[in-house]
Amino acid sequence: MNRDDLCRLLDTPFSQEQWDAISAPLGPFVIKAGAGTGKTTVMTARVVWLVATERVQAEQILGLTFTTKATAQLQARVRSALRRLSDEVHGVPLDEVGEPTISTYHAFAGRLIAEHGLRLGVEPGSTVLTEAASIQLAYQVVTRTQRDLSVLGYTPDKVVSVLRSLDGELAEHGVTPEMLRAFDTRFQQDVETAGNAARRRVQLFDKVIDNSKSRVELSHLVEEYRAARRVRDVMDFSDQMLIGMQLATEFPEVGEQLRQQFQVVLLDEYQDTSVAQRLLLTGLFAGGHPVTAVGDPLQAIYEWRGASVANIDDFNMHFPNPDGSRSRALTLKENRRSGANILDGANSLSTSLRELHDVEPLVTPANPKPAGGIRVGLLPTFAEE
């Protein structure tokens, strides 16, 4: 299937940069796709091209994204595209063409646990706690612990909040409570070594030390909270990713099985993945496996919940070619959504970020939208805005 065939099949005029991403050889590569450049369209077309050219069968493709809504949208677009392929090219029913597996990152980790959790002593039928049940269990741990929490100076409700936050942050960064305690102990020693002169220059030192000591105390509580979940055979979302990461990194046979099952892996919104998610994925699919990550470093907005934009910046090192060399990086920069004036403003505002993340500025296509304009206003009320 050539470019013209695919354009006609999907009724989309693919640009050269889009076609380069769609028809790239099997192997690991990252697509840095700016806003409005057709990221989802390219991912859908990549699936169709791989199946149409018989590189892989549809059911050998794994696609991961973040939300159930995004999963449903990608599934619908891929299913519609494959239906066109089955009708117009293969002339066979869609159920004979097959469908890729598309899910959220957390659902994939949950599947991993269901199939392999016993390797870590985790029952396949473990229940995932609701938000309310998670808070309730944390409150039980806080009110029943033998540790002296008065040193924190928090109310029980506040302790529950910071406990759950720290538990999730540790899981998303792949850091154990023991590792956190070791870091904070060294940090406190370093600050003390800095001496009183430095303390006078930086008045925040005392507050920083207090926060560090609080983290050490809370890290013990995190262990009690996790133990309480294990005893009850329940887990939360942070457990899913942490246990999935452990299965991927500690049991090579799990990765071998999944690489045989999924010949191609597509990773959506990769700029918003966490360290734990990246370690799970590299544990399963690194070493030259055909992994395509798509994302935009300039749209990384979830660092507050553990996301690491370094994952997309360093993709070609985390997912090298089979010979160990760095994998390819492709770019989608042709914005088909906005006019030239809007793109000029966006590029101007993002200059420092683009330089930091090695991202090219957005450009208009051959047949651009109307130039448009930018208005800036500071209005006194939400209603007026």
What are these regions (language model features)?
Residues M1-K32, T41-A45, Q60-L62, G125, ...:
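Accessory N-terminal region flanking or inserted into the helicase ATPase core
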Residues D4-L6, L10, W19, V48-A52, ...:
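Conserved RecA-like helicase ATPase core segment
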Residues V42-L50, L62-F66, A70, L74-A81, ...:
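Structural preference for long, well-ordered alpha-helical segments in enzyme cores
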Residues T65, S86-A197, V216-H220, M235:
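Conserved ATP-dependent motor core of P-loop NTPases, especially the RecA-like helicase ATPase domain
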Residues A70, L74, T104, A133-S134, ...:
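Helical mechanochemical/support elements of P-loop NTPase systems and associated helical scaffolds
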Residues R119-G125, R226-A228, A329-L332:
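Short hinge/gating elements
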